[in-house]
Amino acid sequence: MAMPRVLCRVRLLIHNDFSVISKYSPVVNSVLINKCARFRHSIRHFRTNFPAGLVLNTSQKQDASSSSSDSDSSDSDEDDVTIEYHRGLPQITVPLPSRKERCRFTLKPISNTVGDFLEMLKKEDRGIDRVVCKTIDGTRIASSTTIETLLQDDFKLLINDNAYNVDSPKQERLTTEEVQGLSDVKTLVNQLYEALNVREHQLQKEVELTTQLETLQQELLPLEEKKLELEQVANRRSNWMAWAGLGLMSVQFGILARLTWWEYSWDIMEPVTYFVTYGTAMAAYAYFVLTREEYILNDVRDRQQLLLLHKKAKKTGFDVNQYNVLKDQIAKLELDLKRLRDPLKLRLPPKAAAKEEKKQVEEKAKE
């Protein structure tokens, strides 16, 4: 019975019900009341401080858990194999097992292969005994596979006893329609550039080539006159030699006829005519051996005329080499002008192209 009374008094002291205490207790001891008041104060202090400490411990636990989760995530990131594209080239970052550090490898998608990548890993870290690339389902990837083919799908990288799941970044590729549209835009830009600039460029080029052609023709004009004179002299000389050959053949015919029908008989002159004919064949063969050309009368005449022309040119001081160089340059310029004035390059309609071609024919006729 005493214990419940004490508890009731303590409860009343906490709630400041001193009047009730005096009702139940005939004699109130001041010392007991003071002790109860101290007990009440300590209880009140305990009640106010306990939640604050609890909240502090809870916040510390949350901070610790968050920091641990961040460190775990950073550690997991450092232990993964990542792929990034830098200036169009894939860069693979791999954690090295011996050095406990990450190393970045820059690869060429077309020229490098899986074997090259594995050799790079072994060369960078001598502690790597076994390194293999496999697909997600465990199929080994051949060393001859290109990096471009490897990065088309996700794969696994096995380094010693560690296995890494590698996520290949998806590359954006142009569709057929986009490529065709880009080609159409490129063609349109080229046509606009040609319409605005090419015609003017062609006119400037035509003026430049025409000026050069006129200059070379002026330089060639005195040489042409000199060459014409030499050709006339050589032509007369070659004609004279041709008539001289005909005269010699006539004399030969007359001598053989005289000996056959007047001086001797045919029985005597037949072997003579045979040797004369055979000697003529030997002379033709000797001509082939010396000139490396067949004995054809037109070719013989032209060759003789050319020899006479060079002989006369040396005597008169005519520079044949300069003449040939000027003729080659003029022929080249004329060819360039012909190509420049081609109706297909000018992109003219059919009627305009016909007019342009007629104009070129008239210019050639005037020349």
Swiss-Prot record:
InterPro entries membership: MCU_C, MCU_fam
GO biological process per UniProt: calcium import into the mitochondrion; mitochondrial calcium ion homeostasis
Organism name: Tribolium castaneum (Red flour beetle)
One Pfam family linked to the record: MCU
Record membrane topology: Multi-pass membrane protein
Entry annotated with the keyword Metal-binding: yes
Motif (Selectivity filter): 266-276
Sequence similarity: Belongs to the MCU (TC 1.A.77) family.
GN (gene name): MCU
The protein, known as: Calcium uniporter protein, mitochondrial
Entry GO terms, CC: uniplex complex
